[in-house]
Curated annotation (Swiss-Prot):
Alphabetized InterPro entries for the sequence: Mal/L-sulf/L-lact_DH-like_ah, Mal/L-sulf/L-lact_DH-like_NADP, Mal/L-sulfo/L-lacto_DH-like_sf, Malate/L-lactate_DH-like
Function recorded in the entry: Catalyzes the reduction of Delta(1)-pyrroline-2-carboxylate (Pyr2C) to L-proline, using NADPH as the electron donor. Is likely involved in a degradation pathway that converts trans-3-hydroxy-L-proline (t3LHyp) to L-proline, which would allow A.tumefaciens to grow on t3LHyp as a sole carbon source.
This enzyme's EC code(s): 1.5.1.49
UniProt similarity note: Belongs to the LDH2/MDH2 oxidoreductase family.
Protein name (database record): Delta(1)-pyrroline-2-carboxylate reductase
Catalytic activity: L-proline + NAD(+) = 1-pyrroline-2-carboxylate + NADH + H(+); L-proline + NADP(+) = 1-pyrroline-2-carboxylate + NADPH + H(+)
């Protein structure tokens, strides 16, 4: 008997979507969640793949997210801001709903922003970024989380892991994309270390007393650290301001107060900013996309690689060969499909 199973991307999507439908989520929520989770597995981004299903279901079971939510786009007020209310559901369907209006407005005005309010967000941000680059737009995406990161010089959780992503469209090749937490590592990475009973690298976290630790359990009970010391701390604070306070949504401390735990997916807002390179470069010499390629080629020419290169390579492999899951992963999917919300506590 094989220890692995290989599925097509579509087959995995259907299986994941069925799990969410079985758990009582409507088609709008289930489809969007299944797309982003399948994309994570497709790109070998395991910390944002099927691993995330249980957390999403726990959040539904705890009644902290509405499984039947239908997101709504606010009436066009003539500004560059598109607003979508997730209506207490997940962020992913809200983004899918708002993307066409965001892209149209950014191309017409040169710059536009999508504000998503009242949403639960558990996924990576590169799917949003790639939604922009596929429309020929550059983009910035950010959101808070819940308090799990100590500010530089502090010892207690205050900031969120506060992910931040950027994308630049490229012709006839994969876009330039980076997506990272403003903590040293994503919280999901610490969870994966805990599950694998592996020690953390030094400098990732402190324990509940503020002492450095490499124990994942102690780290989860303590605080993570920002990347780059005071620089990461400042960027994390900026995200609290822009994607929390400025858009009238929750900051990471407020999210933690609302949830009362870090075991559920966080409830907050999300900010997506789209730029038209042609509009910004209009009237200036040179094509912005060609000039960008000169920069990218210079980076590669030094033996460096562009961010997300491994993810895009994994995507190409999955598209040609399928997605391979272990026996344990397949059993986990079967259990979730059979039991629905009863599979999580």
């Amino acid at each position: 008997m094989s220890d692995t199973t290989t599925l097509t991307i579509e087959a995995l999507f259907q299986r994941v979507e069925s799990i969410f439908l079985r758990a009582g989520l409507n088609a709008v929520q289930s489809g969007a969640l299944a797309r982003v989770i399948t994309a994570g597995e497709r790109d070998a981004c395991k910390s944002h793949g099927i691993y995330r299903i249980e957390g999403a279901l726990r959040t539904v079971k705890a009644a902290k997210v509405k499984p039947d939510a239908i997101p709504e786009v606010a009436e066009d007020d003539g500004t560059a801001i598109v607003k979508v209310n997730a209506m207490g559901g997940f962020a992913n369907p809200a983004f899918e709903l708002g993307l066409p209006a965001l892209a149209e407005r950014a191309k017409r005005l040169g710059l536009a922003a999508l504000v998503i309010n009242d949403c639960t967000h558990f996924s990576a941000l590169w799917p949003e970024v790639e939604g922009l680059t596929s429309n020929g737009l550059a983009g910035l995406v950010m959101c808070p989380s819940y308090s799990t990161v100590a500010p530089t010089g502090g010892t207690k959780p205050l900031l969120g892991t506060n992910p931040f992503a950027f994308g630049w469209p490229r012709k006839d090749t994969s876009p330039y994309v980076f997506d990272f937490a403003t903590s040293v590592a994503a919280r999901g990475e610490i969870e994966l270390h805990r599950r694998a009973r592996k020690s953390l690298p030094e400098g990732w976290a402190v324990d509940a007393d503020g002492n450095p630790t490499t124990d994942p359990e102690a780290a989860l009970a303590g605080a993570m650290l920002p990347f780059g010391g005071h620089k990461g701390s400042a960027i994390g604070t900026m995200i609290e301001l822009l994607a929390g306070i400025m858009i009238g949504d929750l900051t990471s401390p407020e999210v933690l107060d609302y949830l009362g735990t870090t075991t559920l997916a966080p409830f907050h807002g999300e900010l997506i900013v789209a730029f038209s390179p042609e509009a910004f470069a209009k009237g200036r010499p040179g094509d912005p996309f060609q000039r960008a390629e000169v920069l990218f080629e210079a980076i590669i020419g030094q033996g460096a690689r562009l961010p997300s290169g491994r993810r895009f390579a994994a995507r190409a492999k999955s598209e040609s060969e399928g997605i391979t899951l272990t026996a344990a992963e397949m059993a986990g999917l079967d259990r979730l499909l059979e039991k629905g919300l009863d599979a999580v506590s």
